[in-house]
Design a protein with these regions (language model features):
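A generic structural signal for residues embedded in beta-strands
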Residues: 332-334
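Short beta-strand-centered segments at strand-helix junctions
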Residues: 305-329
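Short amphipathic alpha-helix that is part of the acyltransferase structural core
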Residues: 1-90, 218
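Anionic-ligand-binding alpha/beta catalytic cores of soluble enzymes and soluble regulatory domains
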Residues: 215-283
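Conserved acetyl-CoA-binding loop-helix of GNAT-fold acetyltransferases
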Residues: 107, 111, 126-129, 134-150
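Conserved acyl-donor/pantetheine-binding loop and adjacent beta-alpha core of acyl/acetyltransferases
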Residues: 80-126, 191-199, 205, 209
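Conserved GNAT acetyl-CoA-binding A-motif
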Residues: 118-127, 147-166, 176, 225-228
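Long, charge-rich alpha-helical interaction segments
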Residues: 181, 190-208, 214-225
Length: 337
């Protein structure tokens, strides 16, 4: 079987909706709501069609297609700048140290502060691979294709990139973190708040969430111990992000307390090490395993293949050339697998 990453279109709505129903809670970028998904696809098509260098709040939706069956089996998203349409809120973990001369005692406490520090940062997110395809490195293909897309359209993205990892969700679909903070102010369960946010944005957080810092020590133990931890299903994703140069810098999601990972865009490994060159006239039979991408905007494609870098040129295998629709002299991006 062969797979290719390509821009999503309205014809992919049903496949995306079926996958959205498989995600479980805490996956706001792929809500199981047809109207929301339709709006996301329409916005993505507008972003792909726009030309220009200015950075605005856009979302590019990509899908993983089985080219033999034409069935979509995964998806991922790239956001040019968060916080344009709706405020982008995070909790930042701070430390406050105080000293009492009378008691001769120093007390240090950790606080959760509601902040907009990350507004304007680009984001990679929305990655979901159908459970039936979780073998053969397709999750890695989805994840790293986003970086080659950014490399190919660097002028449309910011100086930093973030990635939010889903936090700990219990067996009932609830969030200990939400129950300890947000749930006390909104009268909503975690799933209700999560679904509302996915469809309507998080302005309601700005309207009702307390603005004063929250002392972590005052939260119950169940909430404290999940702060900054990814959901077990996201641990591999966290390792992949760390391998790309992302790090956890004390920002957590306001809903489930999951970690927000950050990196300088030009230092992300798959961007910094990406090779850009013209396709050589020789067809490669064997070579270095790689991710190879070609095309701009709505013509973007990415797949696994083989390459041989020859200075400014690159030889690639015949199957990749066919999947990407490239020939001699066309330019491609690639990164070692």
């Amino acid at each position: 079987m062969s797979f290719v990453i390509r821009p999503a279109g309205m014809e992919d709505l049903q496949h995306l909706y079926e996958m959205a129903k498989l995600t479980g809670g805490g996956f706001t970028n792929l809500p199981p709501d047809r109207n929301s998904l339709t709006g996301k696809l329409e916005g993505s098509q507008t972003a792909f069609a726009r030309r220009g260098d200015e950075i605005v709040g856009e979302t590019f939706v990509l899908v993983l297609e089985n080219t033999e069956t034409q069935v979509v089996r995964g998806t991922c998203q790239v956001f040019t700048a968060v916080g344009h349409r709706w405020p982008f809120y995070s909790y930042r973990i701070n430390r406050l140290t105080q000293y009492s001369k009378e008691l001769d005692r120093t007390v240090s406490a950790e606080l959760l502060s509601l902040v907009n520090d990350l507004e304007g940062t680009s984001e990679v997110g929305g990655l979901f691979l159908h459970p039936g395809e979780r073998a053969g490195g397709l999750g890695m293909l989805l994840a790293r294709s986003r970086y080659l897309f950014i490399a190919a359209h660097r002028h449309r993205f910011g100086e930093r990139i973030l990635a939010e990892l889903r936090g700990i969700i219990d067996e009932r679909g609830g969030s200990p973190f939400w129950d300890a903070i947000g749930g006390k102010f909104f009268g909503m369960s975690f799933q209700e708040a999560d679904e509302f946010n996915a469809i309507h944005g998080n302005q309601f957080i700005a309207d009702l969430m307390p603005k004063h810092p929250v002392y972590i020590a005052m939260l119950d133990e169940e909430a404290r111990k999940v702060i900054g931890l990814p959901h077990p299903s996201g641990r591999a994703a966290m390792r992949m992000l760390e391998n790309e140069g992302f790090s956890y810098q004390g920002y957590v999601d306001i809903f489930d307390g999951g970690p927000t990972m950050l990196a300088d865009t030009d230092k992300v490994r798959s961007i910094a090490c990406a090779h850009h060159g013209e396709v050589d006239e020789d067809t490669l039979e064997k070579g270095e395993k790689a991710l190879i991408a070609a095309g701009e905007f709505e013509d973007f494609r990415c797949c696994y293949g083989a390459r041989d870098i020859r200075g400014d040129a690159i030889a690639i295998d015949a199957q990749s050339a066919e999947l990407l629709g490239v020939g001699t002299g066309d330019r491609v991006w690639s990164i070692a697998r």
